[in-house]
Amino acid sequence: MTQPTDTPLERIASFTVDHTKLVPGLYYSRRDGDIITFDLRFKKPNTGDLLSNSELHSTEHLIATLLRNSPEKEAVIYFGPMGCQTGFYFLFDNRLLSCEGAIALLQEVFAAAADFSGEMPGKSPVECGNYSNLDVETGRRVCQFYADLIRDWTVEKLAY
Protein backbone atom coordinates (compact mmCIF):
# COMPACT_ATOMS: atom_id res chain seq x y z
CA MET A 1 0.00 0.00 0.00
CA THR A 2 1.34 3.40 -0.95
CA GLN A 3 0.56 6.30 1.37
CA PRO A 4 -0.23 9.54 -0.47
CA THR A 5 2.20 12.23 0.64
CA ASP A 6 -0.58 14.76 1.22
CA THR A 7 -2.50 12.48 3.61
CA PRO A 8 -1.13 12.27 7.16
CA LEU A 9 -0.78 8.83 8.69
CA GLU A 10 -3.03 8.04 11.64
CA ARG A 11 -1.19 7.90 14.94
CA ILE A 12 -1.29 4.38 16.34
CA ALA A 13 -2.62 3.84 19.85
CA SER A 14 0.71 3.00 21.49
CA PHE A 15 2.15 6.33 20.30
CA THR A 16 -0.54 8.23 22.21
CA VAL A 17 0.87 7.06 25.55
CA ASP A 18 3.22 9.60 27.15
CA HIS A 19 6.39 7.52 27.35
CA THR A 20 8.11 10.19 29.47
CA LYS A 21 5.76 9.27 32.35
CA LEU A 22 5.87 5.46 32.03
CA VAL A 23 7.48 3.41 34.75
CA PRO A 24 7.83 -0.37 35.04
CA GLY A 25 4.48 -2.03 35.63
CA LEU A 26 1.53 -3.78 34.01
CA TYR A 27 -0.86 -1.68 31.93
CA TYR A 28 -4.05 -2.03 29.90
CA SER A 29 -2.92 -0.82 26.48
CA ARG A 30 -5.93 -1.28 24.22
CA ARG A 31 -8.96 -3.27 23.19
CA ASP A 32 -9.60 -4.48 19.64
CA GLY A 33 -12.97 -6.22 19.60
CA ASP A 34 -12.59 -9.14 22.00
CA ILE A 35 -8.79 -8.89 22.12
CA ILE A 36 -7.14 -7.04 25.02
CA THR A 37 -3.51 -5.92 24.87
CA PHE A 38 -1.52 -5.56 28.07
CA ASP A 39 1.71 -3.55 28.17
CA LEU A 40 4.23 -5.33 30.39
CA ARG A 41 6.75 -2.57 31.03
CA PHE A 42 10.08 -3.71 32.48
CA LYS A 43 12.16 -0.56 31.94
CA LYS A 44 11.49 3.17 32.06
CA PRO A 45 11.53 4.35 28.43
CA ASN A 46 14.18 6.65 26.98
CA THR A 47 16.69 6.22 29.80
CA GLY A 48 19.19 4.05 27.94
CA ASP A 49 18.45 1.18 30.32
CA LEU A 50 17.13 -1.48 27.93
CA LEU A 51 16.51 -5.21 27.99
CA SER A 52 19.29 -6.91 26.04
CA ASN A 53 18.40 -9.16 23.14
CA SER A 54 19.24 -12.22 25.24
CA GLU A 55 17.01 -10.94 28.08
CA LEU A 56 14.11 -10.29 25.70
CA HIS A 57 14.53 -13.54 23.83
CA SER A 58 15.02 -15.77 26.88
CA THR A 59 12.05 -14.21 28.69
CA GLU A 60 9.91 -14.57 25.57
CA HIS A 61 10.68 -18.29 25.26
CA LEU A 62 9.95 -19.00 28.92
CA ILE A 63 6.77 -16.93 29.23
CA ALA A 64 5.27 -17.81 25.84
CA THR A 65 5.80 -21.51 26.59
CA LEU A 66 4.28 -21.29 30.06
CA LEU A 67 1.30 -19.23 28.84
CA ARG A 68 0.60 -21.71 26.05
CA ASN A 69 0.78 -24.60 28.51
CA SER A 70 -1.48 -22.98 31.11
CA PRO A 71 -5.15 -23.89 31.70
CA GLU A 72 -5.97 -20.53 30.04
CA LYS A 73 -4.03 -21.35 26.86
CA GLU A 74 -7.11 -21.02 24.64
CA ALA A 75 -7.35 -17.34 25.63
CA VAL A 76 -3.69 -16.60 24.82
CA ILE A 77 -3.27 -14.82 21.49
CA TYR A 78 0.31 -13.52 21.64
CA PHE A 79 3.21 -12.75 23.96
CA GLY A 80 6.24 -10.97 22.55
CA PRO A 81 8.81 -8.21 22.97
CA MET A 82 8.48 -4.51 22.21
CA GLY A 83 10.85 -3.19 19.59
CA CYS A 84 11.93 -0.43 22.00
CA GLN A 85 13.37 -3.14 24.31
CA THR A 86 11.53 -1.87 27.40
CA GLY A 87 8.97 -4.65 27.76
CA PHE A 88 6.48 -7.04 26.20
CA TYR A 89 2.94 -7.17 24.89
CA PHE A 90 0.44 -9.80 25.99
CA LEU A 91 -2.71 -10.21 23.90
CA PHE A 92 -5.61 -12.32 25.10
CA ASP A 93 -9.22 -13.09 24.21
CA ASN A 94 -11.39 -11.24 26.72
CA ARG A 95 -14.32 -13.59 26.05
CA LEU A 96 -12.26 -16.39 27.61
CA LEU A 97 -10.20 -14.50 30.18
CA SER A 98 -11.04 -11.43 32.26
CA CYS A 99 -8.51 -8.71 33.03
CA GLU A 100 -8.43 -9.99 36.62
CA GLY A 101 -7.77 -13.49 35.32
CA ALA A 102 -5.04 -12.21 32.99
CA ILE A 103 -3.27 -10.49 35.88
CA ALA A 104 -3.45 -13.68 37.95
CA LEU A 105 -2.18 -15.72 34.99
CA LEU A 106 0.78 -13.38 34.48
CA GLN A 107 1.59 -13.43 38.19
CA GLU A 108 1.55 -17.23 38.09
CA VAL A 109 3.64 -17.71 34.94
CA PHE A 110 6.28 -15.12 35.87
CA ALA A 111 6.69 -16.74 39.30
CA ALA A 112 6.93 -20.16 37.63
CA ALA A 113 9.47 -18.86 35.09
CA ALA A 114 11.59 -17.41 37.90
CA ASP A 115 11.79 -20.94 39.38
CA PHE A 116 12.09 -22.73 36.03
CA SER A 117 14.55 -25.61 35.93
CA GLY A 118 15.57 -27.63 32.96
CA GLU A 119 16.48 -26.80 29.40
CA MET A 120 15.29 -23.62 27.74
CA PRO A 121 12.16 -24.36 25.69
CA GLY A 122 12.82 -24.10 21.97
CA LYS A 123 16.60 -23.88 22.26
CA SER A 124 17.68 -25.63 19.09
CA PRO A 125 18.48 -24.56 15.54
CA VAL A 126 15.40 -26.44 14.34
CA GLU A 127 13.04 -24.59 16.73
CA CYS A 128 14.51 -21.07 16.82
CA GLY A 129 16.23 -18.68 14.44
CA ASN A 130 18.65 -17.36 17.08
CA TYR A 131 18.82 -20.19 19.61
CA SER A 132 22.41 -19.48 20.63
CA ASN A 133 21.51 -16.36 22.63
CA LEU A 134 18.91 -18.13 24.79
CA ASP A 135 19.90 -18.58 28.42
CA VAL A 136 17.71 -20.02 31.19
CA GLU A 137 19.46 -18.11 33.99
CA THR A 138 19.06 -14.81 32.14
CA GLY A 139 15.37 -15.50 31.59
CA ARG A 140 14.87 -16.56 35.20
CA ARG A 141 16.51 -13.37 36.50
CA VAL A 142 14.34 -11.11 34.32
CA CYS A 143 11.21 -13.08 35.22
CA GLN A 144 12.02 -12.85 38.95
CA PHE A 145 12.27 -9.06 38.66
CA TYR A 146 8.87 -8.85 36.97
CA ALA A 147 7.22 -11.43 39.24
CA ASP A 148 8.25 -9.31 42.22
CA LEU A 149 7.01 -6.14 40.51
CA ILE A 150 3.50 -7.45 39.72
CA ARG A 151 3.03 -9.72 42.75
CA ASP A 152 0.32 -7.47 44.25
CA TRP A 153 -0.93 -5.91 40.98
CA THR A 154 -4.67 -5.29 40.66
CA VAL A 155 -7.07 -4.16 37.94
CA GLU A 156 -7.07 -0.70 39.52
CA LYS A 157 -3.35 -0.37 38.74
CA LEU A 158 -3.74 -1.20 35.01
CA ALA A 159 -4.29 2.43 33.91
CA TYR A 160 -1.34 4.24 32.34
Regions found by a protein language model. Give the residues of each.
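Non-catalytic terminal extensions that flank enzyme cores
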Residues: 1-46, 155, 159-160
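Arginine residue identity/basic-tract feature
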Residues: 11, 30-31, 41, 68, ...
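Weak global preference for isoleucine
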Residues: 12, 35-36, 63, 77, ...
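A general structural signal for short secondary-structure junctions and capping/turn motifs
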Residues: 30, 79-80
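Active/ligand-binding-proximal structured segments within catalytic/core domains
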Residues: 35-68, 78-79
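Short secondary-structure junctions
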Residues: 70-73
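Active-site-adjacent, His/Asp/Glu-enriched structural segments that form or flank metal-binding
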Residues: 81-152
